[in-house]
């Protein structure tokens, strides 16, 4: 089972127990591999319903065993300090090849694990700015810039948009950490 799926579904389960507060933090632990042939049961522990914060703990269970746990917190929206890093100077997503175009161009020459990955339909499309890490095993800087978007239409529900982002969070973090070591998630 793709870890991002479990993250996203866990956040959906937690968000359904909270009214009118966006998630502001989450922390996840993967404990066992999931079995894609059976359903996952999500148990939500309502830790506290405070004036400002609403923490939840979610455990994903299969075969009677915890495969994943998430601690997350929802917060009343309020004014506070705001900062962000400037957007890097990168091509716009429409100026980059789509995943379908990348598949056409590289799938026949790609290693088997890369082919299997690209052959799967996913609910989130990634358009990487730099493709070197897919084929190279050179040591690269441990950073990656990608554009992401849902492949289908999402409902007009900010909580669902946050859950899709949680899903996508598991799509590039591990590979980025391996770049410096000349490794890939496909190894």
Predicted regions and their residues:
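Terminal targeting signals and extreme-terminal segments of soluble enzymes
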Residues: 1-187
């Amino acid at each position: 089972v793709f870890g991002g799926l479990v993250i996203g579904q866990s956040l959906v389960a937690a968000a359904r127990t909270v009214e009118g507060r966006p998630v502001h933090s989450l922390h996840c632990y993967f404990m066992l591999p999931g079995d894609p042939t059976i359903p996952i049961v999500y148990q939500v522990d309502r830790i506290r319903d405070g004036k400002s914060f609403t923490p939840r703990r979610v455990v994903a269970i299969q075969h009677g065993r915890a495969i994943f746990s998430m601690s997350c917190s929802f917060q009343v929206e309020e004014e506070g300090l705001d900062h962000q890093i400037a957007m890097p100077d990168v091509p716009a997503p429409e100026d980059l090849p789509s995943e379908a175009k990348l598949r056409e161009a590289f799938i026949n020459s790609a290693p088997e694990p890369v082919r299997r990955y690209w052959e799967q339909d996913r609910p989130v499309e990634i358009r990487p700015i730099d493709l070197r890490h897919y084929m190279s095993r050179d040591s690269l800087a441990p950073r990656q810039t990608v554009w992401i978007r849902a492949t289908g239409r999402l409902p007009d529900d900010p909580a669902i948009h946050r859950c899709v982002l949680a899903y996508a969070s598991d799509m590039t973090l591990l590979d980025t950490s391996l770049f410096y070591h000349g490794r890939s998630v496909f190894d």
